[in-house]
Amino acid sequence: MLRQLRLTMDISGWIFLPWRRSMSNMKDSPPPPPPLASTFNDVIVDYEDPDYLPLPEYPVRPNEPLETRKQRLLYQSRKRGMLENDLLLSTFAAKHLQNFSAEQTAQYDQLINGVSNDWDIYYWATEVKPTPKEYDTEIMGLLKEHVKNAERVTRLRQPDLNI
């Protein structure tokens, strides 16, 4: 509550700043109140190079059992944060993930978790942009075929989970 009040006071100070300036020209007016500490300064991160923002590395899980990895990848395929990839990757995972070998599962893990931007995965899968060599794997080929939808399957929602 206090944080919201401070933010409201800061914003109202910006709105009424021109009025305060005109009032400050008057001799008998009281001085303006001191500005409150801005809450926006609390969240600003200042890097020396503004064009470079470090992205966290995806943690490699070398000792993760294959079945656990497949369950995690199924979840991550369904919860991408963008509907287009949610539909494409969840239907792809439901169709192919259980039949993947350990190597194919590792390739799929690298594909969906190694890329920092989900739009890249979408553009590569739909062949709008060329796929970089490190992601142009057997799994990406399967995903591209899946996206072409030669079977003309309606994909308006994610497939049900088989629990």
Curated annotation (Swiss-Prot):
Keywords per UniProt: Chaperone, Mitochondrion, Transit peptide
GO annotation terms (biological process): copper ion homeostasis; mitochondrial electron transport, succinate to ubiquinone; mitochondrial respiratory chain complex II assembly; protein-FAD linkage; tricarboxylic acid cycle
GO MF annotations, alphabetized: copper ion binding
Cell compartment(s), UniProt: Mitochondrion matrix
Domain of life according to the entry: Eukaryota
Entries under Gene3D superfamilies matching the protein: Flavinator of succinate dehydrogenase (1.10.150.250)
Family to which this protein belongs: Belongs to the SDHAF2 family.
Binding partners and assembly: Interacts with the flavoprotein subunit within the SDH catalytic dimer.
Its biological purpose: Plays an essential role in the assembly of succinate dehydrogenase (SDH), an enzyme complex (also referred to as respiratory complex II) that is a component of both the tricarboxylic acid (TCA) cycle and the mitochondrial electron transport chain, and which couples the oxidation of succinate to fumarate with the reduction of ubiquinone (coenzyme Q) to ubiquinol. Required for flavinylation (covalent attachment of FAD) of the flavoprotein subunit of the SDH catalytic dimer.
Protein name listed in UniProt: Succinate dehydrogenase assembly factor 2-A, mitochondrial
